[in-house]
Amino acid sequence: MTSRQSKTNLKNTYGSGKGEPEEDYITPGPFELERLFWKGSPQYTHVNEVWPKLYIGDEATALDRYSLEKSGFTHVLNAAHGRWNVNTGPEYYRDMAIEYHGVEADDLPTFNLSEFFYSAAEFIESALQSDRSKILVHCAMGRSRSATLVLAYLMIYRNMTVVDAIEQVAKNRCVLPNRGFLKQLRELDKQLLLQRRNAQSNEEENLEEKEI
């Protein structure tokens, strides 16, 4: 599946989605979001678990078929799919029990990665439905493109704000999406915030009608 445009398993303590954001929550600006990454994990290794069964890694991790199989990975999301990036694809894993999804993205502030947020998030969520699944989301360095897609997933499916998502990922891996990707995550945050507040408002109105 493709959308155009020796490893150590680390044990981490995970937070949970914080549900509905506070009423006075406002999406921070790009600089404020960047500062959140500075407070995160200083370690940079080939691959890190950032959420249960969800890992962010680099090109070396994705190319190491032996370690992937030994570690039990069942899904791979390549955020740098393509001939001039990390050129793997379904054929690279054809004799392995791995489901592949590729996103052909460039690590440039001008690249519109947001058009892949929902399809990538859906692939991750589908993978995590099985207790036996383990998914690697990678790009070349495992810092920008892959991290951005994982952040979007946590926001879409785990009801996190962009701040919650960054704190969750950054405490487990040294990542830093480019400024353009951060702006796209800000827009996603504002869209999701509006949707959730509207949904909450509708629920409250329905409850009031039932009480009358």
UniProtKB/Swiss-Prot annotation:
Limits of the Tyrosine-protein phosphatase domain: 46-194
Classification of source organism: Eukaryota, Metazoa, Chordata, Craniata, Vertebrata
Record flagged with keyword Nucleus: yes
Entries under CDD domains matching the protein: DUPD1
Pfam families from the UniProt entry: DSPc (PF00782)
Residue positions of the active site: C139 (phosphocysteine intermediate)
Assembly information from the UniProt record: Homodimer.
Enzyme class, UniProt record, top EC level: hydrolase
Residues that hold substrate according to the record: H138, C139, A140, M141, G142, R143, S144, R145
Annotated catalysed reactions: O-phospho-L-tyrosyl-[protein] + H2O = L-tyrosyl-[protein] + phosphate; O-phospho-L-seryl-[protein] + H2O = L-seryl-[protein] + phosphate; O-phospho-L-threonyl-[protein] + H2O = L-threonyl-[protein] + phosphate
Entries under InterPro entries matching the protein: Atypical_DUSP_subfamA, Dual-sp_phosphatase_cat-dom, Prot-tyrosine_phosphatase-like, Tyr_Pase_AS, Tyr_Pase_dom, TYR_PHOSPHATASE_DUAL_dom
SUPFAM superfamilies from the UniProt entry: (Phosphotyrosine protein) phosphatases II (SSF52799)
Protein name as annotated: Dual specificity phosphatase 29
